[in-house]
Amino acid sequence: MENEAKKPLELYIHIPFCVKKCDYCDFLSGPAGKERQREYFLALEREIAAVPDFSDREITTVFIGGGTPSVPDPSLVGEMLDQIRNKFFVAPDAEITIEANPGTLYKEKLQIYLEHGINRLSLGLQSPQNRELKILGRIHTWEEFQESFFMARDAGFSNINIDLMSAIPEQTYADWEKNLRTVAGLSPEHISAYSLIIEEGTPFGERKLKLPDEDTEYRMYENTAGILEEYGFHQYEISNYAKGGRECRHNKGYWQRIDYLGLGLGASSLLDHMRFSNTADMKEYIGNSAFPDKIRQNMESLTEADEMAEFMFLGLRMTEGVSMEAFAEYFGKNMENVYGEVLKKHLEIGMLEQKGDRIYLSRKGIHVSNGVMADFLL
């Protein structure tokens, strides 16, 4: 049917390049020369050409992540987006985000992004204190960040996210509060505030670091929402805060289990009850990207039990929680019949709360969210 509503599909595109790998980073990324970057975008072009056009779907969001997707020549990003618009039905109001690091942006680059439909910028600041940026091994300064932020505003970006990191080595509670107020004072539309996680195999994983103690980390997290509220932000997910209507639609799609297709090196997908990812081997990806079946790995067909568990533990990441009605509509089962004991236990001990149709994590529950969510695995 011509007027029938198309089912939503999100796109994630992985650009694995950066200027220098940060000391805490365990993402699939690294520096590369111009030739390797061009070679990669050609491989990406072949993958996009080879996947189905999903004519029954509407692309509601596109997220270009990395790495640092603002490192390559902007014309490569622009050409890729043109190909995507020619291949898929991209909704006129689609949210199109690119991640960028301070110091990798200039006016013409931002202009090219806007001309090709990018309407949301996610800036990886991490901290407005140069001392903390140095500890993290970041290559930009707070001054360079401000220059990039105001340049993006002048270019016409009206939807900007800023990434912040707490529990940085040697960081005090006062440092964190100052960081929040400094960044909120810039009035971005969205702030993502993550706690530093020390990953094995990274330079941080091998060092003896002076990290904030548990009580300090607890206070940092617990007070973030209240501080940001003073500046007009509301918390809508465990680590995300937005001004009215500026929640990240792409990430909300992940938590609401909207299908997404991952393109590029190591990119993950959720498609028609299947989860899979592309190879993380660059040589293999470049050689076989024209044959999507050859680069796909970790194919997992989700059972109904898997999907119900995902509905619960992904949905509970959002402050609005999960809807019992939506669960019944999707699975044809009553949530209380499936998870009655788990719900009863966590409602009684105050980890979950219920308001009308919705069940959500309490403030207390958010701090032990992984433990609560694990109980929904049948």
Identify the function of each model-found stretch.
Residues G332-K345:
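Short amphipathic alpha-helical interaction segments
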Residues K364-L378:
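Short, amphipathic alpha-helical interaction segments positioned at domain boundaries
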Residues L11-H14:
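Short active-site neighborhood of thiol/selenol oxidoreductases, capturing the structured segment around
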Residues M1-E4:
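Basic/polar N-terminal segments that are highly enriched at the extreme N-terminus
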Residues L347-D357:
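A short, conserved structural fragment
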Residues R358-S362:
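Minor-groove-contacting beta-hairpin "wing" of winged helix-turn-helix DNA-binding domains
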Residues K6-P8, D26-V51, E58-K333:
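C-terminal scaffold of the Radical SAM
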Residues P16-F27:
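Local cysteine-cluster metal-coordination motifs and their immediate loop/turn environment
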